[in-house]
Structures are given as structure tokens and as C-alpha cells.
Amino acid sequence: MQEKIKNVKIYTDGACSGNPGPGGYAAILIYKGIEKEISGGEPNTTNNKMEITAVVEGLKLLKEPCDVTVYSDSAYVVNAVEMGWLESWKKNNWIKADKKQVKNIELWEELLKLLNVHNVKFVKVKGHSDNEYNNRCDRLAVSKRDEFLI
């Protein structure tokens, strides 16, 4: 009998002081009540790059194909996937509708590869509200960002 595909939740967030500036990202993975936190940062980055990185790094931790719900407060990341922007950008050689080049192409390409492995749904959550996991991700991302401010 084939084992049922695992259902994983991933909460993500990115933080940046200045844009560009020092930044951090975080993800919390939840599977059957077990939680795993990851975080990291860069000395000179953008908020969007940190938001995308959080999703990519979270998905990279999965060791087998999973059903995944990604919760993000980044409308940019959620809409890029759920509204088909990402596929359109790729089809148009990474040129947006406004004729400008998409930023962070390498990360978007990595995300596309991961989306082909996992069945991923993105859900937009309100940032800095009452969502416990989003708030924890925010604190982790800010903490990593702050390491570059000292």
C-alpha cells in the first residue's frame, strides 16, 4: 500500500532595514505538530529577496514530495505564484508586463523547480497581526537582519 503524501505547513517571512540593506528571512515548517525553524540573512539585500528566500529555503528542507501550504505576508510572492505571474515571467524570458526585467531570477527559477516537486498552495496572511507563526517568523527574520546592524 502506498504511503499517503505528507501534508506540511510552512510559514515564511523576510525583513530588511533599508531596501536594499541588511536583511533576514525565516521559515517555520509544521508536520504532525512537529515544528522546525530556519533563518538566515544577508548584509546587503532587499525585502523581496528575503521573502522569496524564506519560501525556497523552507521547501528545500523537504526530503520527499509533499502537499504544502505556504503562508506568507508577502503579496508579491503569493501573487507571483497564485496569479501565474511567475509562469508568465519565465515564458517572456523574465521580462514583466512593464517591459522591465524581473529581479531575483535565480531564486524564482529555484522556486519553480521546487514547485514541480511539491504540490504547493500559497496563502496570504496579514503581517504583524495575530498569526502566531507569522509573528514568530517575523521575530526570527528581524533577529537575523539585526545581526548585520551591530
What positions do the PLM features span?
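A short acidic-Thr-Gly-centered motif at the start of a beta-strand
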Residues: 1-4
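Residue-level marker for buried hydrophobic side chains located in beta-strands
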Residues: 8-10, 70
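RNase H catalytic domain
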Residues: 15-22, 56-136, 140, 145-147
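Short, glycine/acidic-enriched capping/hinge loops at junctions between secondary-structure elements
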Residues: 21-24, 39
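Short beta-strand scaffold segments in enzyme catalytic cores
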Residues: 24-31
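A short, polar/acidic, helix/strand-boundary loop motif
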Residues: 32-50
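Short amphipathic alpha-helical face segments that pack within enzyme cores
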Residues: 49, 53-57
